[in-house]
């Protein structure tokens, strides 16, 4: 298992064209309660669990639109051990057996934004054999939708990797709300598209490009702890979120027509690679007024922004927070130093 980070509508109006389902679930056929009886063997529906305890993964009753859904509870602190993952095996085999020409993997799902008090980033990711490819989820600290993407860095290929993406939408979403999200990755062209509540955006990042050629190997539902700012304490209680009605497909069609897709990059900020061992890149067209790094205790560490890079070689391995101020406001992201 590759761990590089720690509306019932299926977007039928957004995802068009011929497609074949590779993996899906609506959880309605499962027994309420624990997803599995073990952290080491697959449970209901072939779901595997990673991190935490059996009780952290539950099938719960929903409403008329969502009869049952998967609820995941994160840990009670801000460390990586509070992260949670749910995954099935079989995506790599299904992708390898797809119909010839169906080189676009795309997914849609509903996320329940969950806990309002503690902080979490919860959603889904598609992983390849060695790295993350694409992901999208809800950030409870900013109440916004954040993306993930593997990017090739124009100025320094050694910094290629899995990046955190903010600025996908200016909309915010409160706690305990269902939001419909989607994504696509084109193996042939490398194009990545995100869909938030029916609105599509093709990813374009200043100083970087998406990468073609990756084969999807695993679909992960995941949650990781975050903090609202560097002065906030780490999570002092559990965090929750939910997932329902997900569909992962292989298709030969792009998401919408090119005239219907928003191609806006002025608000996009990509931070990574995450994890990193030497440099943290900040890729954006926005003017960066300030960049500061803090450890998880809230202590500021020495760092200097040089162009669009921060040298982190001197940092001890572990989790850190980067606090950015741009002309569009503040961005707080967590990253891991290897």
Report the location of each language-model feature:
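Short, aromatic/His-centered strand-loop micro-motif at the edge of beta-sheets
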Residues: 154-179
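Bacterial Sec-dependent N-terminal signal peptides
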Residues: 1-23, 258-261, 274, 319, ...
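Secretory/extracellular carbohydrate-interaction modules
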Residues: 69-151
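Flexible glycan-contacting loops in extracellular carbohydrate-active proteins
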Residues: 205-244
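C-terminal outer-membrane/trafficking sorting elements
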Residues: 262-338
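Extracellular glycan-recognition surfaces and repeat-rich motifs
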Residues: 34-75
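Extracellular beta-strand elements of beta-rich domains used
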Residues: 27, 241-248
């Amino acid at each position: 298992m590759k761990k590089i980070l720690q509306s019932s509508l299926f977007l039928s109006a957004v995802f068009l064209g011929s497609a074949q389902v590779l993996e899906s679930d609506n959880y309605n056929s499962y027994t309420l309660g624990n997803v599995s009886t073990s952290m080491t063997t697959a449970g209901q529906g072939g779901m595997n669990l990673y991190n935490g305890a059996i009780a952290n993964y539950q099938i719960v009753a929903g409403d008329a639109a969502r009869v049952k859904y998967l609820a995941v509870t994160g840990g009670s602190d801000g460390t990586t051990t509070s992260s949670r993952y749910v995954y099935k095996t079989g995506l790599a085999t299904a992708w390898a057996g797809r119909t010839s020409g169906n080189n676009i993997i795309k997914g849609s799902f509903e996320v329940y934004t969950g806990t309002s008090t503690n902080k979490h980033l919860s959603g889904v990711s598609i992983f390849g054999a060695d790295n993350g490819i694409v992901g999208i989820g809800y950030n409870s600290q900013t109440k916004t939708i954040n993306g993930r993407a593997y990017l090739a860095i124009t100025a320094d290929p050694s910094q290629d990797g899995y990046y955190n993406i903010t600025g996908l939408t200016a909309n915010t979403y409160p706690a305990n709300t269902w939001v419909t999200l989607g994504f696509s990755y084109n193996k042939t062209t490398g194009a990545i598209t995100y869909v938030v509540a029916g609105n599509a955006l093709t990813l374009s990042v200043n100083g970087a490009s998406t990468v073609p050629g990756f084969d999807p190997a695993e679909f992960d539902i995941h949650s990781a702890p975050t903090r609202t700012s560097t002065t906030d304490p780490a999570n002092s209680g559990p965090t929750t979120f939910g997932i329902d009605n997900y569909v992962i497909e292989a298709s030969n069609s792009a998401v919408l027509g090119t005239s219907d897709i928003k191609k806006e990059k002025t608000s996009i900020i990509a931070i990574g690679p995450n994890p990193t061992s030497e440099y943290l890149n900040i890729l954006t067209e926005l003017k960066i007024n300030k960049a500061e790094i803090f450890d998880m205790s809230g202590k500021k560490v020495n760092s200097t922004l040089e162009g669009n890079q921060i040298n982190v070689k001197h940092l001890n391995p572990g989790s850190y927070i980067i606090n950015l101020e741009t002309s569009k406001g503040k961005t707080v992201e967590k990253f891991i130093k290897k």
